Regions:
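ATP-dependent phospho-/nucleotidyl transfer catalytic cores
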Residues: 1-45, 53-69, 77, 161, ...
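ATP/Mg2+ or Mg2+-diphosphate-binding catalytic cores
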Residues: 142-204
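Hydrophobic packing residues in well-ordered alpha-helices of helical domains and bundles
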Residues: 21-24, 99, 137, 159-163, ...
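Glycan-recognition and catalytic cores of secretory/periplasmic carbohydrate-active enzymes
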Residues: 49, 54, 75-77, 100-113, ...
């Protein structure tokens, strides 16, 4: 309830009722259903550039070349979660061709590790990428709500200043999937935006 309670109700002063509330509920149901079908692994939950440290001194071994911070909340969750967190970052916006390139590299390494033996993911990067997008959508909605709460309840305005990035992610993703069309229209209505556009592996 972070998104409707904090981002919509508190930040946007919008309480959804009737058809709009039903649209949000159906979108959330679809997102949860998609995300829960993914295979699970250990996930960091906040895998982003700010939590990745590279030593400044030379002579380190490959195992010492990357430090990972803030891992105390790691859980067992969808294999799509960390790559979605990294490539749709809270504080940095990557070009979409770069996002796709890095996600392909992740997919290829995961295939070699035997982690893509699910449905047609092993042979179809597009299927995996769509799953990453749905996982990212869940995270974007949650974090938009968290950032609104941090600002409005906890007095930390710097967080809500990054909320437009998440709305951009949400709009671009919902634009690609027909079943999320009503949700996109609802977001556009609340934000006062026109229709979004972006890459898609076939609009589905």
């Amino acid at each position: 309830q972070l998104f409707p309670d904090w981002y919509l109700a508190q930040h946007r002063q919008t309480t959804l009722q009737g058809k709009d509330a039903e649209t949000l509920s159906k979108a959330f149901d679809s997102i949860v259903k998609r995300c829960l079908t993914a295979p699970t692994v250990h996930v960091h939950r906040d895998f982003m550039p700010r939590n990745l440290m590279i030593p400044a001194h030379p002579g380190t071994t490959p195992a010492q070349q990357l430090g990972v911070l803030d891992f105390q909340d790691a859980v067992h969750g969808p294999i799509t979660y960390d790559v979605a967190s990294l490539m749709r970052d809270a504080f940095l916006t990557w070009e979409e061709d770069f996002v796709i390139d890095i996600t392909i590299r992740y997919w290829e390494k995961a295939r070699k590790a035997g982690l893509m033996d699910f449905e047609d993911w092993h042979s179809d990067f597009g299927a995996f990428y769509r799953a990453v997008e749905w996982m990212g959508l869940q995270r974007h909605l949650k974090v938009a709500g968290i950032f609104a709460r941090l600002t409005l309840r906890d007095g930390k305005p710097k967080y809500l200043a990054d909320a437009p990035r998440f709305i951009h992610y949400i709009r671009n993703t919902t634009h690609r999937y027909r079943e999320l069309g009503p949700f996109l229209k609802l977001i556009d209505q609340i934000e006062g935006f026109e229709a979004a556009s972006g890459y898609a592996f076939g609009r589905v």
